[in-house]
Amino acid sequence: MFALSANAADGTVGTVSVQKGNNVSVNGEAPVSLTLDGKDPQSCQFLSKRAPDENHEFTWKEVTTTRGGELAEILGDQLRSVDSLVVKGYVNDKDFHAMWDASLYGYLSVINLKNAVLENNAVPDTAFFHENEQYEGSSHEIFYYIGLRKIILPEGLEKIGEGAFYQASALRQVNFPSTLRYIGDFAFNATKLEMNQLVIPEGVEEINQYAFAFCRKLKAQVTLPSTIKKLASGLFMDAPSLLSICQRDLSLLGR
C-alpha cells in the first residue's frame, strides 16, 4: 500500500533523494525511477471536505464508552460538530473510523485518549487515512486532508500501526506512551509534527520504514531507545529541519 521504490540505472538501490521538480537520485546517482503505490509522483491539490459553517461555535465534548464501537452512536448528530473530544472507556477500529470521519468531514482537531482502553493496545493501521475517500482523480490529483492537530495517546498503547497517521497533514502534536513497542511503516509520514524534542521511549523495539519521512516541520533533537532491534530505511527521509538523531547509551547517529 505504501511501497516506495527507487532503482538506479545499474539496478542498485540506496538512499532516496527527492528534490523540487521530482528530480530523484539514489545515493546521489541518477537516473532513477520513483513510484508511490505503483504510480508516478503527481502534483496534488489539498482541499477540505468540511462544509463551511459561519455560525459554528467551538465545541468540547467528553464521552465515556462502555464497549468498543459505540462512539458514533453516542455522539450522534454532534459527530461532525465537535472540535475537541475526550474519550474514556473502550475504543476499537469502528471508533477510530468515527474520529477520522469527524476530522475529515467535521471540525474535530483535538483528541484526548489518555483514559481510553484501545482494542489490541493499538492504533490500527490507517486509522486516520482512507485512500478511497481522501484521494480523488485517476492520478490522485486532489487530496482531502483531515483537520486533526493534536492527539493524546494512552498508557498501555503498544503499537502504532502502518500508516496510522499517514498524510495527517495538520497533525502537530502527539505523545509516545512508555508502553509503546512498535511504530509501523509510514505511521507519521507527511505530518506537520512540531516538537523540540522527539524522544522515542525505552521499550520500543521496531520503527519501520518511512515512519517519519516528509515531516518537514520537525525541528527536533531525536532520541532513540537502547531497546531498538529494527530501524528501517528512510525513517526520517526529507525531514530537513532535524537537529540530530541519537540513540541512548550509544553514539550520535547523524541525520
What spans do the regions from the language model cover?
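N-terminal segments that cap or nucleate solenoid repeat domains
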Residues: 16, 24, 36, 55-99
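Consensus positions within tandem repeat domains that build extended binding/scaffold surfaces
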Residues: 127, 161-164, 184-187, 208-211, ...
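Serine residues within intrinsically disordered or low-complexity segments
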Residues: 17, 25, 33, 233, ...
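Structural signature of tandem-repeat unit edges
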Residues: 12, 58-66, 83-91, 106-121, ...
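Short, T/G/N/S-enriched strand-turn elements that build extracellular solenoid repeat scaffolds
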Residues: 70-78, 94-103, 122-127, 163, ...
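Secondary-structure capping and domain/repeat boundary segments
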Residues: 4-56, 199
